[in-house]
């Protein structure tokens, strides 16, 4: 095996063409075996193996710096930079993350997980090199739809006039997660169809030199192209056309479905565990399709992905012009939603909580200053969802619940989630953001209302005395479970579902203060700036009530085990009940 002998990129630089082909086959087999066991971003990585071998053959990493956009396609890079053990030894499969990680290797220049950032990051490295009088090559590898992001275009605009060594490898596999959209990608297709000679060339228009490689899975052609641009004295783009999912028939036939995949049987491609449908996503898809049929002015927006609700290709086709994929451009999607709402349409833009972070300014300025009644659906909002530091979904409450004019709601059941969605789309007074539950009540413990226009009205789920548990969104169930624990100890706790994250039910809080001396807030997010601190601030001005805020501290967590993290911060029902008993002694 070649991989067992590779400890750094220098180990492959003396390889012959045949050895490189054998190495690529070995890497591809290792990737397929590993992903079949633990899952991961298999499609992008299978398509970039030859380019990674060529990059590490030509360039001298880590002296020459290679920045991976998104970095979900870094598995082959990790194989060649001292981490092959994590791809060939099943016992060590989990030793490395799925993204570049500066804690793992000096060959990983940044911790990256969001799209369209590599050109900007690398441009800073290039400028710093020039200021220091360095001579290393700076390479930004970008693809998988990331070129449609505004930051990528802003970066192109800057590097076009750097006048110094800067190499962009554009990995063109004609895919984002789903299909690419937009005029830019039509022009990229023209470049592919003309062997890179089409007159409309974005990169040349931005002031960069341009080199085209028709077969981006031909290692020798790539080595020739990279050798040609190595040590260049001006910015250059090497446009390589790759085959996403190369070498695995299932991934080649269904690049969207195999962008990222759960563990699977290699022979059949069937997942090893049956996928458990997300009831919230399924109900949301049904709602979107139903609303589109009834309301010709309804539009669902996505940004290069289907927003965590799993709109199938057939669903997207059925929506027709009522579905708009803006590419990986969340900021644009939010502003477009504002324009749609101002123009009389009824838009929903849905994406993951982690990606909504990119849209703060548009949400504040373009939407909320203008009071545009657009609807935004945040998914993946839980410490129990993605555990990689680049994709955490529990900062959104602190970020968005404090924007004036934005009504942010956290429903707690499928029935309530759809009721809130329906109200949000039908009303035309407020910008509304909805935190789609990750988990929640199987059956709603109280009657679900249909009108949420009387803002900030919380729901008393059960009545008690002395102890009040306020469970936010996903943690509404946790509040009820903690109340059950306390009931077994003879304490009847009151449980409240606030529903609204952007404001307080001050009348209810004042009323509850009369017969409750201990109040606990539980939220699936960070405490600082969160809902619980709003409650603490409210009672802090009055005195006489002790408030304890439960949630996560303001820090980044990486590759954690959710249950362990929850226990660390006492986010389990037995721990919460024990804390209450201790406080009441």
Predicted regions and their residues:
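A short, small-residue-rich loop immediately preceding and capping a beta-strand
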Residues: 38-40, 64-67, 111, 132-149, ...
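A glycine-rich helix N-cap at a beta->alpha junction
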Residues: 86-96, 161-173, 368-380
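Cofactor-binding active-site loop characterized by glycine-rich and histidine/acidic residues
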Residues: 41-162, 298, 312-313, 453
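Non-catalytic terminal/interface segments that mediate subunit docking, oligomerization
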Residues: 248-372, 471-473
């Amino acid at each position: 095996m070649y991989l067992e002998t590779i400890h750094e990129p220098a180990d492959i630089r003396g390889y012959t063409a045949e050895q490189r082909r054998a190495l690529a086959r070995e890497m591809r087999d290792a990737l397929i075996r590993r992903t079949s066991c633990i899952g991961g971003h298999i499609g992008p990585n299978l398509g970039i193996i030859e380019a990674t071998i060529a990059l590490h053959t030509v360039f001298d990493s880590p002296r020459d710096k290679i920045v991976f956009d998104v970095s979900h396609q870094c598995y082959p890079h990790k194989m060649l930079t001292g981490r092959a053990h994590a791809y060939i030894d099943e016992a060590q499969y989990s030793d490395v993350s799925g993204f570049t990680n500066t804690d793992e290797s000096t060959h990983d220049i940044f911790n990256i997980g969001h799209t369209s950032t590599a050109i900007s990051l690398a441009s800073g490295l290039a400028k710093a090199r020039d200021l220091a009088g360095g001579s290393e090559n700076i390479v930004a590898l970008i693809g998988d739809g990331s070129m449609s992001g505004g930051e990528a275009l802003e970066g192109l605009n800057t590097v076009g006039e750097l006048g110094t060594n800067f190499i962009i490898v554009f990995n063109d596999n004609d895919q984002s997660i789903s299909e690419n959209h937009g005029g830019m990608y039509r022009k990229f297709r023209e470049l592919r169809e003309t062997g890179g000679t089409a007159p409309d060339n974005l990169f040349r228009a931005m002031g960069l030199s341009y080199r085209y490689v028709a077969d981006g899975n031909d290692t020798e052609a790539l080595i020739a192209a990279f050798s040609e641009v190595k040590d260049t004295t001006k910015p250059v783009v090497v446009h390589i056309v790759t085959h996403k999912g190369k070498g695995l028939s299932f991934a080649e036939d269904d690049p969207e479905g195999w962008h990222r995949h759960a563990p699977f049987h290699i022979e059949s491609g069937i997942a090893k565990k049956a996928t458990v449908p997300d009831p919230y996503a399924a109900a949301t898809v049904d709602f979107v399709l139903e609303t589109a049929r009834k309301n010709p002015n309804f539009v669902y927006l996505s940004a290069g992905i289907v927003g965590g609700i799993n709109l199938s290709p057939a669903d997207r086709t059925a929506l027709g012009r009522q579905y708009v994929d803006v590419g990986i451009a969340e900021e644009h999607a939010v502003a477009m939603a504002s324009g749609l709402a101002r123009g009389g349409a009824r838009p929903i833009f849905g994406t993951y909580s982690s990606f909504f972070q990119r849209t703060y300014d548009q949400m504040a300025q373009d939407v909320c200053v203008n009071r545009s009644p657009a609807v935004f659906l945040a998914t993946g909002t839980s410490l129990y969802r993605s555990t990689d530091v680049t994709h955490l979904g529990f900062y959104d409450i602190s970020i968005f619940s404090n924007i004036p004019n934005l009504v942010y709601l956290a429903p707690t059941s499928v029935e309530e989630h759809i009721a809130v969605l329906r109200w949000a789309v039908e009303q035309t007074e407020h910008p509304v953001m909805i935190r789609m539950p990750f988990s929640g009540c199987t059956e709603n413990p109280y009657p679900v209302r249909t009108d949420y226009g009387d803002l900030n009205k919380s729901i008393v789920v059960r009545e008690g005395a002395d102890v009040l548990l306020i469970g936010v969104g996903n943690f509404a169930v946790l509040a009820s479970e903690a109340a059950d624990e306390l009931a077994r100890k003879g304490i009847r706790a009151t449980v409240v579902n606030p529903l609204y994250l952007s404001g307080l039910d001050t009348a209810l809080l004042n009323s509850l203060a009369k017969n409750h001396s201990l109040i606990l807030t539980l939220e699936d997010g960070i405490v600082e700036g969160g809902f619980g601190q709003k409650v603490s601030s409210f009672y802090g001005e009055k005195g006489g009530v002790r408030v304890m805020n439960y949630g996560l501290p303001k820090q980044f967590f990486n590759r954690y085990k959710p249950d362990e993290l929850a226990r660390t911060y006492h986010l389990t029902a037995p721990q919460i009940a024990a804390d209450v008993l201790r406080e009441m002694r």
